[in-house]
Amino acid sequence: MIQPMASPSNSSTVPVSEFLLICFPNFQSWQHWLSLPLSLLFLLAMGANTTLLITIQLEASLHQPLYYLLSLLSLLDIVLCLTVIPKVLAIFWYDLRSISFPACFLQMFIMNSFLPMESCTFMVMAYDRYVAICHPLRYPSIITNQFVAKASVFIVVRNALLTAPIPILTSLLHYCGENVIENCICANLSVSRLSCDNFTLNRIYQFVAGWTLLGSDLFLIFLSYTFILRAVLRFKAEGAAVKALSTCGSHFILILFFSTILLVVVLTNVARKKVPMDILILLNVLHHLIPPALNPIVYGVRTKEIKQGIQKLLQRGR
């Protein structure tokens, strides 16, 4: 039975030093079974992304701008998975629900900053495909290792700076009563609702920053793929058009899935009273797990050069 840290009688005097995470309150007896698919997805995400990183690092033929961007995406996926899933599994397996005040806000910062970093990486990769298909002769002079280095710095700095105020503002609130978070993770709104203060500023900043970052990235992604589609439809060689549509189509579908599930999570958090709590919690967990599991498959394993790189590494190991 989960007990809050302070009772109503002393909630105004006893500060909160840790939080308790409650996962799927209506399915407590099913948590061990729920952990099985989550564990498999976690192992898939970690294994696939680690394999992709090692392959790109060790195979000299993959030391190219696009694959460096794939490495960045895999690194972001690994950090996101390690930030969220081990704690969720610890709750399921060992009932370790407590999370310290600093750890909670560190998790919040990583989640809030790394998800926009992923969308920004998708945007740069979409631009890479746009240049490769629409301006193939200029591709080597535009998409260089120096370009990727600058883009990577921009991705990290922009999102870290603009999302840092979210956990900072939330941590500055006073927590002096209920300490049970109705979630598996330290989501900003789930934590803010436990504070004794008005957190309107937090909600406004998260909304503006989140939609500014994600909205601008998604707009540029869709714009890039619009130009790509227009260029592909003009291809005279049918085989080239089919190949380009197959590759870029799978990328676009994955990005669409990523943005859709993120939009659903945001909307369900806003309308949380109309959405079953367990559904809301499940969505919060899955949108940190499914994209990291799918990214290396769609962007990596389906790529001929990546397959060849993995085969070479396996042959060396024999």
Curated annotation (Swiss-Prot):
Q: Which GO terms describe its molecular function?
A: G protein-coupled receptor activity; olfactory receptor activity
Specify the protein's topology with respect to the membrane.
Multi-pass membrane protein
* Assigned keywords, A-Z: Cell membrane, Disulfide bond, G-protein coupled receptor, Glycoprotein, Membrane, Olfaction, Receptor, Sensory transduction, Transducer, Transmembrane, Transmembrane helix
Q: Which PROSITE patterns match?
A: G_PROTEIN_RECEP_F1_2
What is the annotated localization of this protein? Cell membrane
- List, alphabetically, the GO terms of the cellular component aspect: plasma membrane
Transmembrane residue ranges: 33-53, 62-82, 107-127, 147-167, 204-224, 245-265, 281-301
Gene3D superfamilies with a match to the protein in the record: Rhodopsin 7-helix transmembrane proteins (1.20.1070.10)
Q: Which domain of life is it from?
A: Eukaryota
Q: Which residues are glycosylated?
A: 10, 188, 198
Primary location recorded for the protein, binned into one broad class:
membrane
Q: Which residues lie on this side of the membrane: Extracellular?
A: 1-32, 83-106, 168-203, 266-280
Q: Which InterPro entries match?
A: GPCR_Rhodpsn, GPCR_Rhodpsn_7TM, Olfact_rcpt, OR51/52/56-like
Disulphide bridges, residue numbers: 104-196
Q: Which residues lie on this side of the membrane: Cytoplasmic?
A: 54-61, 128-146, 225-244, 302-318
Q: What does this protein do?
A: Odorant receptor.
Family note = Belongs to the G-protein coupled receptor 1 family.
What protein name does the entry list? Olfactory receptor 56A1
